[in-house]
């Protein structure tokens, strides 16, 4: 009986869809196509540390040992938000590159050139996509995308672009604490102390900038974080869930199911 009822529901859905006007039918297909393309592009994360995901040692542990993330499907709106963020990154990077042509004392530095000139042998250039460079730190087993390096008024800075909604942007007073470890990881990789954050409202495209200075203590703490996680990996024991981890870190975590099992 239950099976027949379910078949009837599917028939009803098909019937309704067949009765839709072509413009609505097209829109539904467009939305679904966006989601299907995103699902096809989903891949298992590499077994490396990611600077943007180093706010929970247990999360890092699961990634390093290759635990399959929770299955999830992004809505077409979320896919659009991510794509919009990528587009904004490209436009801002291009605008920064054009500053020199407009007579300003600012130069957008090619990351691969910077790595070679500074003889940063631990860094491997994995790929380049436009103005973004994907790198791998061999000693730390860390992979990341870099928005860029600039030389502004004679000093080098790591450039990090962040897009956010208008509510977060309006209340933005400083660098988000969840981005501290990411900035520290970049500093450790490039040997530069200062990370220039530019936060962009994805709604009205206004911008705010903040400087984050990385200290030797911060870099040492991050190296200790990696070393501690590596020891858990070697012993095949999941680290305790940090008590200080922020709620949003848990909310956006891709390993919630496994984390609950490990208690």
Predicted regions and their residues:
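Short, glycine/acidic-rich beta->alpha junctions
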Residues: 140-141, 175-179
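Soluble or luminal CAZymes and related metallo-dependent hydrolases
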Residues: 84-88, 178, 221
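Short beta-strand-loop-alpha-helix junction that forms the active-site gateway
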Residues: 161-174
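Metal-dependent nuclease catalytic cores that hydrolyze phosphodiester bonds in DNA/RNA
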Residues: 1-158, 165
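Short acidic (Asp/Glu) and glycine-rich catalytic loops that position anionic groups and cofactors
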Residues: 68-71, 163, 202-207
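Metal-dependent nuclease catalytic regions and adjoining charged, substrate-binding loops involved
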Residues: 1, 171-176, 189-263
